[in-house]
Amino acid sequence: MFLKYGKPEYMTALFEEGQLRVQPASEYAKPDHNGAVRDDELALEVYLYLTRETIRNVVSNPQDVPEDLEWKRVDFRFSRPNDFWLYCVTSSAEPRLFVDFNAAACVIIRDREEFRRRLLAAGAAAFPGARSRDGNAIYIDPLRPRSARIDVPLSKHFKYAYQVEHRFVWEPASTNPLTYRDVVLGSLNDIAELVLL
């Protein structure tokens, strides 16, 4: 099951017509968003604790690594050089999400696979030449990342883990500035239900 929370007029349009807006990832960093929405989707900072041996293996001057160094915290900023389009849904039916997303409605999508198929098909037409992919968000504890490889479009700080996101990403081939795109999937009334508060 997927859920999308929002204003009644937008959720009604999503349910009745399959109409949705896909934003550039950079849009979410704007200060007018609340704390549940605002995030730098183009970068993620993590902090790794490396042993002396590991540091010696990766630096160009291993002879300069002090002998008495046991470990060192190294700060990394994983970032995307280019913007991408992003659309998120959740698997969580927590009442808190109505408040966090300033929502008075939600669409409950019962058939995840059919919604995914429709969105990716409509996305192929809306984002020609873009590489599309989707997946569950990977929540990263910046002090204890499980890997030094971070997939920025699918990754988020673990403070957002309660949102249980599934992300749809379209990565354009060009580096031109992006604007939102309105995408239409057709009515979702066969795979979803609309809840208005």
Where are these regions (language model features)?
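NAD-dependent ADP-ribosyltransferases
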Residues: 1-197
